[in-house]
Amino acid sequence: AVLDGQHRLKAYLELGLPLEDLVVIEPLNKGVAIALLIAEMNICTKTWKGSDYMAAPAMAIKETNAAFDFAMELQRRNFPLSTISFWACGNNKLKAKDLVASLKTREMPQCLQEADGWCAKSRKWFEAASEKFTAKFLAKKYLITFIQDGYNAADDASAYTSEMEEKLKNLTQWQADKIQNARKTSTQTQEQIILDLLREHL
């Protein structure tokens, strides 16, 4: 029902048809917009708890930017929202409730509006990393939070940005596989081992 409703809503928006003529279900609260109802269903229904949270906002938002487009690209690759937030915004501020709120305002969440500068850097890192790491590994927060911590601590952020891009490009496939295939041991968690390997090779 949720998917069917989204398809109908998208068709109405693309054809420029009046949304008041679209009937998905008979609402108990007629004051709730259909697009908002669909988004609420996506977020509150466990079946749709994965990557579908951005579909309805993407149809409703009037104007986007590079950060939003990057976030949508990652969403299509089934990245979780928390990881998308770090890649696209440089923080963990992008929340599902903000995307639902954007349906009412038809504006992007504030953290995406302010993220173009970060996104210009992180997209370069992502593209370089994608040549060596799998999407499954990049969908976890290990790499982007490691990069972000280094960026925040850098004396020269511009130099760090370029250096990290080069380091990612120069990473051998053997090194990348060693990092992304790391497993926990009796003395270290998987995260600790991955972070140690990232420090060693990047």
Features from the language model and the residues they span:
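Accessory terminal alpha-helical modules
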Residues: 1-202
